[in-house]
């Protein structure tokens, strides 16, 4: 394997773009903190971090395999390794299988409940790339998939999925729909041309209102989570800071353009970090 092929595999796994990994990792780590009522065992932090990174790459590979013919028509994606012919579909499938096995080995260190949930997580990861063909809001499926680690974190620590896990899960789904709609704005013109469905297409000229709506719902659910868990004022201060980030992002993505939308999308990882920090503060 030469240097060019290694670079192609690196690009296929999106390791050069770590922001989506952080968008998955922060809610997962936050869930571990919430479930543990403090800092969790280091082994869980390691297992879940590896799991997030590996399953994110698996999702990217499945996505590129599913979209190989569509990506040729989109300026942002027509140079991807599979679309450009740097790697074959066969190469991608073998890498996907190998990484899935790595993720499954990690899960084997956890309890039976979490092992069973991992199959649901895999199903969602496979489903998302294909639902863009028939489901009007694929961002909802992405939200279910990206944040499923929340359930797995609670099942690992508590062997159950309590009410607070559901509240946090739904909050992060709303957040995901919002930030991935921003991301989809970058490709909306191309998606309309080739018939790909997205929330950015569905919401049309009201898209900015819907993004703000889902941001508001995520904040509201975080407040409900804070009340349910009897969190202190630092938690609500963090929620206020998150709302300021949402406002800042609004003025960025409202300008449209690929760069503005991608930058607004990427800034959401700071929101995930803030939520993680204020969750940790609750148990110090």
From Swiss-Prot:
- Tell me how this protein sits in the membrane: Multi-pass membrane protein
Transmembrane segments in this chain: where?
A: 19-39, 42-62, 85-105, 107-127, 134-154, 165-185, 211-231, 233-253, 261-281
* Keyword Hydrolase in annotation: no
Pathway(s) served: Cofactor biosynthesis; ubiquinone biosynthesis
Q: What is its EC number?
A: 2.5.1.39
Query: Which cofactor names does the annotation list?
Result: Mg(2+)
From the Swiss-Prot or TrEMBL record, state where the protein is found: Cell inner membrane
Q: Name one GO molecular function term.
A: 4-hydroxybenzoate polyprenyltransferase activity
Keywords attached to this Swiss-Prot or TrEMBL record, sorted alphabetically, are: Cell inner membrane, Cell membrane, Magnesium, Membrane, Transferase, Transmembrane, Transmembrane helix, Ubiquinone biosynthesis
Which top EC class applies here? transferase
* Catalyzed reactions per annotation: all-trans-octaprenyl diphosphate + 4-hydroxybenzoate = 4-hydroxy-3-(all-trans-octaprenyl)benzoate + diphosphate
InterPro entries registered for this protein in UniProt: HB_polyprenyltransferase-like, Prenyltransferase, UbiA_prenyltransferase, UbiA_prenylTrfase_CS, UbiA_sf
Give GO BP annotations, semicolon-separated.
Answer: ubiquinone biosynthetic process
Cellular compartments per GO CC: plasma membrane
Similarity field: Belongs to the UbiA prenyltransferase family.
Q: Which HAMAP family match?
A: UbiA
What's the stated role of this polypeptide?
A: Catalyzes the prenylation of para-hydroxybenzoate (PHB) with an all-trans polyprenyl group. Mediates the second step in the final reaction sequence of ubiquinone-8 (UQ-8) biosynthesis, which is the condensation of the polyisoprenoid side chain with PHB, generating the first membrane-bound Q intermediate 3-octaprenyl-4-hydroxybenzoate.
Q: What is this protein called?
A: 4-hydroxybenzoate octaprenyltransferase
Tell me which species this is from: Francisella tularensis subsp. tularensis (strain SCHU S4 / Schu 4)
